């Protein structure tokens, strides 16, 4: 069905990119075979496959490899938080190694920039959790050098303020006050050391 939609879209628009969009496309159990099928169909026409953001998991290297088959887009990854402690609290089974290996592979394939999505203001968050955002973004930047691709990679860390939602474990927690948000943004910017890394919040 996805292939049929892609064929019709290409036939009617002539666009040279097919976007696989959903809440988390990279979590689809057949994402690799879907991408392989689309690449076989469209690679000769120089039509690339793209996804808005990738969940960090053990298949991330395979996904970025398939996205690079035609042209190199910037890669967007969503680690959400930067420490194991906070991951346990929000129940995200993300491993640092998966993120760094995925970034390493992306730089090696010729990607020139990367974007990371994070949250701040999660209940019980500490200074170390916030500092971890900057450290993680810097490590991703360094992975370009580790991959033998020259200098540091251009990384943008987009940090949004956590908003407690109804019918979730955090529904009774207050949202962070504007004064806290303003001060925390300033702190993140102050921690920034590498010109190749930009903290956006």
Specify the residue positions occupied by each region the protein language model found.
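Auxiliary Fe-S-binding modules of radical SAM enzymes
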Residues: 11, 122, 130-201
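Canonical Radical SAM [4Fe-4S] cluster-binding loop centered on the CxxxCxxC motif
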Residues: 1
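Conserved SAM/AdoMet-binding glycine-rich loop
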Residues: 4-115, 120-154
